[in-house]
C-alpha cells in the first residue's frame, strides 16, 4: 500500500543517512498517516489522511 495522503497527495521524501564517518545510505521519510472515516459528498468513506490535513480541518469526520 502506498504511503500517500488521500486528501493532499503528500508522499514520502527521500534522502540520505549520513554517519559520523560520513558513510552514506539511502533512506526515506514517510508521511504521518492516520486511518479516518470521513464524510465525502454525503457518504462515509475510509481514508488514509496525513496529520497536517487532519489538523487543518479540511475534512469532516463521520
Swiss-Prot record:
Keyword Cytoplasm: no
UniProt-listed InterPro entries: Bacterial_rp_bL28 (IPR050096), Ribosomal_bL28 (IPR026569), Ribosomal_bL28/bL31-like_sf (IPR034704), Ribosomal_bL28_bact-type (IPR001383), Ribosomal_bL28_sf (IPR037147)
Any Pfam family the entry gives: Ribosomal_L28
One of the protein's GO biological processes: translation
Keyword Lipid biosynthesis on entry: no
Superkingdom, taxonomy of origin: Bacteria
Keyword list, A-Z: Ribonucleoprotein, Ribosomal protein
Gene Ontology terms: cellular component: ribonucleoprotein complex; ribosome
Signal peptide: none
Single GO MF annotation: structural constituent of ribosome
Family in the record: Belongs to the bacterial ribosomal protein bL28 family.
PANTHER family found in the cross-reference section: 50S RIBOSOMAL PROTEIN L28, LARGE RIBOSOMAL SUBUNIT PROTEIN BL28A
Protein name: Large ribosomal subunit protein bL28
Amino acid at each position: 500500500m502506498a504511503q500517500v495522503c488521500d486528501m493532499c497527495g503528500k508522499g514520502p521524501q527521500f534522502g540520505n543517512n549520513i554517519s559520523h564517518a560520513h558513510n552514506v545510505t539511502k533512506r526515506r521519510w514517510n508521511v504521518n498517516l492516520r486511518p479516518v472515516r470521513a464524510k465525502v459528498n454525503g457518504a462515509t468513506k475510509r481514508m488514509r489522511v496525513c496529520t497536517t490535513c487532519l489538523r487543518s480541518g479540511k475534512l469532516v469526520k463521520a
